[in-house]
Swiss-Prot record:
It is an enzyme of class 7 (translocase). It comes from Wickerhamomyces canadensis (Yeast). This is NADH-ubiquinone oxidoreductase chain 1. PANTHER family: NADH DEHYDROGENASE SUBUNIT 1 (PTHR11432), NADH-UBIQUINONE OXIDOREDUCTASE CHAIN 1 (PTHR11432:SF3). One of its GO terms (cellular component) is mitochondrial inner membrane.
Length: 351
């Protein structure tokens, strides 16, 4: 049983790393088409092997470390950041009953694990012995802490409506209506905060490409740089999956003629005259995984479209957006929504 769990984790992490790698290719191709150019198109068919070529190039390069820096911490920091980013996948449900760890406090687990990853950013900034990386890591940490407060407040509001911390229960409660419909403003704020939390454009204030400053990764090269890069794109994917689970019904379909996928799955089973129970279960899993993945791909492409469309915000505007606009608005909603639920005696709107 232990060996089977280890194999499941390894297979899941391999698929995650492959999806993260090809997200970089999708981003470069999308940005190319939006800027009226082709993008990567040499390595493989239409540039589909560009991710493998980039990975090999960066992994085979020499690791150059600043002489006066703490060499051990520079190597450990990206490993810490990537490992804690990957650990968040342990509680993500891809279909009914398909998750490495289905715990009752899975949402709290994701919040805690996601907060620990910021230590990698702090450590690499402090250990690089460079003012650029130190200042960038401090600014990045301040930004992450600020917008984690926004995300946590959003999630508390969702918990008030669902009365649970279990992600599978979140999905089951949305069989009748997705949470994005009653909480549309909170869903929009949540998505904006997700972009800021991952330090993506237009919130990438720690970077300055024209001055060759890449935030806390300025002094990194080769494999440490790759690990931080993987951590950034992994955070994009995991946050899109979490957004889908919280607001868009997770792996559930929500169309009258599909009826959460059961009618479509039954049609396929009857059409091909499938009687094997295990095979039917596999078909259901495939449909649910495709559904949640398709929803997440749409939100992930939203990150790319925002990057190509909007200019970078000034740092003071970024901070004011969090502390002056979003936070007072969410705190007022956090006070208002429990009162409304108490008045109508419906602290769990789905029961």
């Amino acid at each position: 049983m232990i060996i089977l769990n280890i194999v499941e984790m390894i297979v899941l992490f391999i698929f995650i790393l492959l999806s993260v790698a090809y997200l970089t290719v999708a981003e470069r191709k999308t940005l190319g088409y939006m800027q009226r150019r082709v993008g990567p198109n040499i390595v493989g068919y239409y540039g589909q092997l560009m991710a493998i070529a980039d990975a090999l190039k960066l992994l085979l390069k020499e690791i150059i470390i600043v002489r006066e820096s703490d060499k051990i911490l520079i190597i450990i920091s990206p490993i810490i950041a990537l490992c804690f980013a990957l650990l968040s996948w342990a509680v993500i449900p891809f279909s009914p009953g398909i998750a490495i760890g289905d715990m009752n406090y899975s949402l709290l687990y994701i919040l805690v694990i996601g907060s620990i990853g910021v230590f990698g950013t702090l450590l690499v900034g402090w250990s690089s012995n460079s003012k650029f990386t130190l200042l960038a890591s401090i600014r990045s940490t301040a930004q992450l802490i600020s917008y984690e407060l926004i995300l946590t407040t959003n999630i508390i509001i969702c918990i008030l409506l669902n009365n649970t911390l279990n992600l599978n229960s979140f999905i089951d409660n949305q069989q009748t209506i997705w949470l994005i419909l009653p909480l549309l403003p909170i869903g929009i704020i949540h998505y904006i905060a997700r972009i800021a939390e991952t330090s993506r454009p237009p919130f990438d204030n720690v970077e300055a490409e024209s001055e060759l400053v890449s935030g806390h990764m300025t002094e990194l090269s080769a494999s440490p740089f790759v690990l931080f890069y993987l951590q950034e794109y992994n955070n994009i994917v995991i946050m899109c999956f979490l957004n889908i689970i919280l607001f868009f019904g997770g792996y559930l379909f929500w169309l009258p003629f599909i009826d959460n996928g059961s009618n479509l799955i039954n049609f396929i089973i009857n059409y091909f005259n499938i009687n094997n129970f295990n095979f039917i279960y596999i078909i259901e899993i495939i449909f649910y995984v495709i559904n949640i993945s398709f929803k997440s791909i749409i939100l992930t492409y939203g990150f790319i479209w925002v990057r190509a469309s909007f200019p970078r915000l000034r740092y003071d505007l970024l901070v004011n957006l969090c502390w002056v606009i979003f936070l007072p608005l969410l705190f007022s909603l956090l006070i208002l929504i429990p009162h409304i639920l108490y008045i109508f005696d419906s602290f769990n709107i789905y029961n």
